[in-house]
Amino acid sequence: MGEYKKYWIAVVAVLIIGFSILGYLGTDVYHQAPPVPTAYVSQDGQVLFTKEDILHGQSAWQSTGGQSVGTVLGHGAYQAPDWTADWLHKEVSVMLDIKSQEAFGVLYNQLGTAQQAAVKEVVKEEYLGSAVREDGTVVLSPERIAAMNATGRYFVELYGDNPDLTLTRDHFAMKDNTLPELQDRIDMARFFFWTTWMASTQRPGTDATYTNNWPHEPLLDHNPTPESVAWSVVSVIILLCGIGVVVWLWSFGKK
């Protein structure tokens, strides 16, 4: 035991330091967590769905395997896409078409470069400015509601048994009726929308979204913040340096 004492001391020190940092950052993450609005409402005050619906949808999604079958918030998955990124791209694509037809009478991809830039800027402003009001609700425009509903139908059918999506389910290694109950699928889609909302809405007092512009979405000019990139690079460097130090100490100790 005595010959390994210094190694045990090192292990204990690493655990104490590591869990102390983890606890501190975990507390900070808890306080900085994106809000779950009490409800999403239309401009005329109609309640579209509530916080309870979102939380029920989260539980419904987790019951299918959670992050084992697709992921949320850009975590990345071995099986199926990241649903936040997928939803965001699909919804923004629909939104751009709606706004283009309103302004110019044609779809977004039929516009010229200058017109596309103008439409994109309008959509970006709406998404970034979709803030929580003092009463805890978020107001959605008729166009955003239409885009949300169109996107939601795809996910409800994907997790159901729509034969048109059988091949897609095969590609994602999903079975028919992955989530059998219709209401569970509807609320799950609402949960996915909420993750998309936090990924595309500007955090008050900052120049980035609640998720630091992640997942990346070119249609909204969303790119990871410099801080996110810097910390990612630093963490990899620290990991490699740590491994190098351990190997060096082990080799030096044996000599």
Residue positions per predicted region:
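Post-cleavage N-terminal segment of exported redox proteins
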Residues: 1-49
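Juxtamembrane interface at the cytosolic side of transmembrane helices
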Residues: 1-6, 241-255
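Generic amphipathic alpha-helical segments used as scaffolds and interaction surfaces in large
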Residues: 4-7, 228-233
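Residue-level detector of short, conserved catalytic/binding motifs and their immediate flanks
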Residues: 12-14, 67, 81, 234-236
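Hydrophobic core of alpha-helical transmembrane segments in multi-pass integral membrane proteins
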Residues: 16-20, 239-246
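Soluble extramembrane regions of membrane proteins in the secretory/endomembrane system
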Residues: 32-229
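Alpha-helical transmembrane segments
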Residues: 230-242
